[in-house]
């Protein structure tokens, strides 16, 4: 496992099988937990961000039986998440106000996406092109919006 912690940018890139990556970030104002590209079966990618104005970009490809977790606490955070694999999961949690999330899961089966947003003015856009799969979006607060598509 590699861990890079930089005040402005944190990136994690792995290729292979049975890999794990974690990017913890604390503080606010422009942390970017991004460039997370985690490929190969049985992979795990975790990004944790605390503070406001953070962004997370994560991608898992050809990653059957893999998990992708993003947790953001604070306001004005954004997450862009993609996963293309079978038997895999995405779990995104955002707490605060004015957060946004875009999640895509494609070419998979038996996969799941869970989005939880707590606070006000949050938005989520979820697209899933997968068979025998599930999407669960929970928003608690006011002025939130969500769009979900399954194909």
UniProtKB/Swiss-Prot annotation:
Induction: Under control of the CsgD transcription factor, part of the csgBAC/ymdA operon. GO terms for molecular function: identical protein binding. Keywords: Fimbrium, Signal. Its main location: other. It is found in: Fimbrium. One of its GO terms (cellular component) is pilus. This is Major curlin subunit. The lineage of its organism: Bacteria, Pseudomonadati, Pseudomonadota, Gammaproteobacteria, Enterobacterales.
